Amino acid sequence: PRLFPLCVAVLACLGLSLSAADRPPNILMIVSDDHAWFDYGFMGSKAVSTPHLDKLAAESRVFPRGYVTNSLCGPSLASMLTGRHVHRHGITGNDPRMPAVEGAKGAGKAAAAKQKSAAFLEGRAQMIKLFQQSPILPRLLGEQGYVSLQTGKWWMGPYQTGGFTEGMTKGGRHGDEGLDIGRKTLAPLTDFISRAKKDGKPFFAWYAPMLPHDPHTPPERLLAKYRDKSPTPQAAKYHAMVEWFDETIGDIRAH
């Protein structure tokens, strides 16, 4: 699946001397998943309602033309966190390249069998090792006294491999427990922000929920809003997912 960076509230603090600033900025990095670039109110969409994102965009500098050299999840996330193109950080796919597993019929069974193989696990370990050879944003910020949190999509093993001080992902292929963020709860993120503020620590929070990515299971109250005005039932579900994601941004900003 494709990932589209949404509103990346990342300030260019790494290029500055933090000692020269009165106070290091807090950073919240927001990444939506499988979200068409035009499906925002501030981008002119009439199909979806995104009031919270529109408000954020109105307060921000918006870059409407962004391009990636690899539209897969893992490589794109690696580029966001390292500031490097794919050919430099070396993460060219979500998974290591593997031959087909014999005896496993069906795409689902074949994928499950492959991901349990020793060769696959070793390949993933090598990808993570390669990723760690690049400068990684949470690690660099940690050297400047930041605390950091990983939530949502994450392909590079447990959150610690990215230099985060806290996180939800324990090491699953693309996020495991981290994928609960946004869909089931915002507590890990809001609790982290409250704790960092209480402790007087500058923070970096990575919010990359699996929204509006499938499975498209929006709340019924939102789906009902789009049933009659979307061209297809599937489009209605997707549009409702986009607004659901927007609601989480409002909840976070209100915290």
Can you name each region flagged by the protein language model?
Residues 12-255:
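Formylglycine-dependent sulfatase
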Residues 1-8:
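Bacterial N-terminal signal peptides that target proteins for export
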